Amino acid sequence: MKRTYQPSNVKRARKHGFRARMATKQGRSILKRRRAKGRKRLTV
């Protein structure tokens, strides 16, 4: 049986990357929250 997690860096960046976050209002609010919290890494 094939496992469910088949990692791909391209898919990862497209779904959760910085540009993907900046593309939507919700995504920008996530970045804002993470900056406020003082996260070292905002996105993957």
From Swiss-Prot:
InterPro entries in the record: Ribosomal_bL34, Ribosomal_bL34_CS
Entry protein name: Large ribosomal subunit protein bL34
Gene3D superfamilies noted in UniProt: 1.10.287.3980
Ranges for region Disordered: 1-44
Keyword Hydrolase found: no
Domain of life, per lineage: Bacteria
Alphabetical list of Pfam families matching this protein: Ribosomal_L34
GO biological process: translation
Similarity comment: Belongs to the bacterial ribosomal protein bL34 family.
One Gene Ontology term, aspect cellular component: ribosome
